[in-house]
Amino acid sequence: GSLSGRTQLSKGASMVLNGDVVSTGDIVNAGEIYFDNQTTPDAVLSRAVVKGNAPVTFHKLTTSNLTGQGGTINMRVSLDGSNASDQLVINGGQATGKTWLAFTNVGNSNLGVATSGQGIRVVDAQNGATTEEGAFALSRPLQAGAFNYTLNRDSDEDWYLRSENAYRAEVPLYASMLTQAMDYDRILAGSRSHQTSVSGENNSVRLSIQGGHLGHDNNGGIARGATPESSGSYGLVRLEGDLLRTEVAGMSLTTGVYGAAGHSSVDVKDDDGSRAGTVRDDAGSLGGYLNLTHTSSGLWADIVAQGTRHSMKASSDNNDFRARGWGWLGSLETGLPFSITDNLMLEPQLQYTWQGLSLDDGQDNAGYVKFGHGSTQHVRAGFRLGSHNDMTFGEGTSSRDTLRDSTKHRVRELPVNWWVQPSVIRTFSSRGDMSMGTAAAGSNMTFSPSRNGTSLDLQAGLEARVRENITLGVQAGYAHSVSGSSAEGYNGQATLNVTF
């Protein structure tokens, strides 16, 4: 087809090109130009992606001069590595002003592979034609698979679509979901220091409220196989209760169960330090514990098994992606207390933790997202230094008239224990793949961010018996990563322990 003379589209006007079109005059565009009929609802989908397998014939629009007045040219492109697209040809003249290019990815479902060479030529300057530096720009993000595609002007005056060296923001965002879920599970399980433990023969129920900040430093980013940089907060409520306390062959045995509900929200950064998005996780957990304590020596061992249901939502500027899954955790911890003085105790501790995670696969606006089974292991070595009060309530001296003798205690008379717990935590053997791609062969990209690393952890706490059967505990802590991609942050917790 052909266009005779000067063609001018005012704002709000549109023109549909059927086949190759040559304009014998200039084109001035403030409206919309469409290659083929892309205005039908079945042809254009959100986020510049068309699904389907119908063969596509690409076309050219040729003109001597194009003056952009904020108008848009809607073009089709196949992001399957074939470098095929509609083209705008500037023949011997100039492209000036400002023209927006809107691309629709056509062909097989959500094609998306890395471009090769100079990229996909979409504006072809021929016979000495020139194009101003700002003559063209993308009107909307173009994404497929793991890639962002950008519009670039080369020294030959042509304009090309290229996949960025850096992956699209959703790559580190989705990869961080594995890390965030497992970080939360480990925090919830904690160590023995996260319980207010009162010695005695009676069963007890404990209610804990915990919150804190958690993050990962930039250690090279997703492109170098590291956990993406992130920073966020969490909060949880945990209720646990003893089911059985008994003596067996010189050992004190305690078993119980716990349940917890929590939420975490983490901001994730791209490899270049820009914001990738936010991941939110609502989690519900059930667990059980077994404690064995050697009566004469005090040597103890804690065994914990925990399962957590995660409901996660990752939000970026271009996508809202949801995934659900299950996290599993097993922990074995042991310690042996030594009395330094009558009221001071030193207790070396060692803890091993294994974690697993499985998240559901899904799809966002640019392709599929698949998660491999995640797992990681931790070893914590440290010691606990603190007072060694037997927490006997005794008789108080308060002169206040009270209903119960057990409340006749001044604050300074309450039985109190304090403790500090420095540790080194080594995370190793971390696994967990996240794959993104489309139906196109060669589009699949797999990312395996490592969570291996070492951190230093310091916890401190205080517990006071305020009634014969009630103990209150508070604690705070800080973890600092010294190598690799281990987590760091701070936490605080308050615990109410009631025996019966």
Identify the residue ranges that each predicted region occupies.
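Primarily extracellular Gram-negative trimeric autotransporter adhesin
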Residues: 3, 20-22, 26, 159-179, ...
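Extracellular beta-solenoid/beta-roll
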Residues: 1-100, 104, 109-163
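Alpha-helical protein-protein interaction scaffolds
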Residues: 61-63, 366-370
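Outer membrane beta-barrel translocator domains of Type V secretion systems
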Residues: 164-349, 354-356, 360-362, 450, ...
